[in-house]
UniProtKB/Swiss-Prot annotation:
Disulfide bonds join 14-20. One of its GO terms (biological process) is killing of cells of another organism. Belongs to the frog skin active peptide (FSAP) family. Brevinin subfamily. Keywords: Amphibian defense peptide, Antibiotic, Antimicrobial, Cytolysis, Disulfide bond, Hemolysis, Secreted. It comes from Rana dybowskii (Dybovsky's frog). GO terms for cellular component: extracellular region. This is Brevinin-1DYa. InterPro entries: Antimicrobial_frog_1. It holds the Pfam family Antimicrobial_1. Antimicrobial peptide. Has low activity against the Gram-positive bacterium S.aureus and the Gram-negative bacterium E.coli (MIC<15 uM). Has a strong hemolytic activity.
């Protein structure tokens, strides 16, 4: 589960901060 969360974190930050 942790590995999945770490994999999704960059995309989440990308959506939140609009820095893709």
């Amino acid at each position: 589960f942790l590995s999945l969360a770490l994999a999704a974190l960059p995309k989440f930050l990308c959506l939140v901060f609009k820095k893709c």
